[in-house]
Amino acid sequence: MSHTIRDKQKLKARASKIQGQVVALKKMLDEPHECAAVLQQIAAIRGAVNGLMREVIKGHLTEHIVHQGDELKREEDLDVVLKVLDSYIK
């Protein structure tokens, strides 16, 4: 079973939190707010996205790399994670 399926409820809860934070940000942008408050909300969204990314990467590393018996498959899965990290960190 894929770790994203196994951890579906936890990951969906994180995604819902992010969605709520984005909705709140959009409302903030419709009304006058201090820049600091808007920046704080953006930082909260970024933190939540980072947390979701961390959980998915952690599951991927554990399931597809640490517990993977096939060396070739392990290397392929590691390449996938490294490419995602490269694009995310840009």
Curated annotation (Swiss-Prot):
The keyword Transcription regulation applies. It is found in: Cytoplasm. It comes from Escherichia coli (strain K12). Coiled coil: none annotated. NCBIfam families: PRK15039.1 (NF011613). This is Transcriptional repressor RcnR. PANTHER family: TRANSCRIPTIONAL REPRESSOR FRMR-RELATED, TRANSCRIPTIONAL REPRESSOR RCNR. One of its GO terms (biological process) is negative regulation of DNA-templated transcription. Keywords: Cytoplasm, DNA-binding, Repressor, Transcription, Transcription regulation. Its main location: cytoplasm. One of its GO terms (molecular function) is transcription cis-regulatory region binding.
